[in-house]
Amino acid sequence: MATLYDVPPEELIEALTETLADEDDIEAPDWAEFTKTGVDRELPPEQEDFWTRRAASLLRKVAVDGPVGVNALRSEYGTSKQGTTRYRVRPHQKTKGSGNIIRTALQQLEDAGYVETSENDGRRVTGDGRSLLDDTAGDLLTELDRPELERYA
């Protein structure tokens, strides 16, 4: 039985994106197409499936690091900034990602039943969320044709 730790994260997030795209509870809000993903960005994301991709990434991060709060996830999705994007004029300064995007996506994952709020600890994955991750990882492991992953099958 494969778990989410047995497959590469990029492929798992890609497969979860396709799975979460079919969910009714997970869809981008109206404001999402105009919102930057952090202070260090100049423009909103250009990907069509950005919202479901971020939700899939959040689901994996909560499963690996959970229970985890929004502030810790903001730090995970942040980057470093050296002044404006055009003029790199100062030393690196760590900035955080957008809390509203993370919070709203987590609330949608809660509505779908994949994440729950634990008291005073943040959010953690439910049994349904863990089984979705592990089932997706198992399907992905059989699809991937990579010799280094054969020992997990």
UniProtKB/Swiss-Prot annotation:
Is the keyword Ribonucleoprotein assigned to this protein? Answer: yes
Q: Where is this region: Disordered?
A: 77-99, 113-139
Q: What domain of life?
A: Archaea
Q: Which Gene3D superfamilies match?
A: Winged helix-like DNA-binding domain superfamily/Winged helix DNA-binding domain (1.10.10.10)
Q: Enumerate the GO terms in the molecular function aspect.
A: RNA binding; structural constituent of ribosome
GO CC entries: cytosolic small ribosomal subunit
Which PROSITE patterns is this protein grouped with?
RIBOSOMAL_S19E
Please name the Pfam families in this protein's record.
Answer: Ribosomal_S19e
Q: Which UniProt keywords apply?
A: Ribonucleoprotein, Ribosomal protein
Question: Does the record carry Nucleotide-binding as a key word?
Answer: no
Q: Where is the composition biased (Basic and acidic residues)?
A: 120-133
Q: Please give the biological process terms from Gene Ontology that the record holds.
A: ribosomal small subunit assembly; translation
Q: What does the similarity note say? A: Belongs to the eukaryotic ribosomal protein eS19 family.
- What does the subunit comment say? Part of the 30S ribosomal subunit.
**Function statement:** May be involved in maturation of the 30S ribosomal subunit.
What HAMAP family does the database record attribute to this sequence? Ribosomal_eS19 (MF_01474)
**The protein, known as:** Small ribosomal subunit protein eS19
Q: Which organism is it from?
A: Haloarcula marismortui (strain ATCC 43049 / DSM 3752 / JCM 8966 / VKM B-1809)
Origin organism lineage: Archaea, Methanobacteriati, Methanobacteriota, Stenosarchaea group, Halobacteria
| Gene name tied to this protein | rps19e
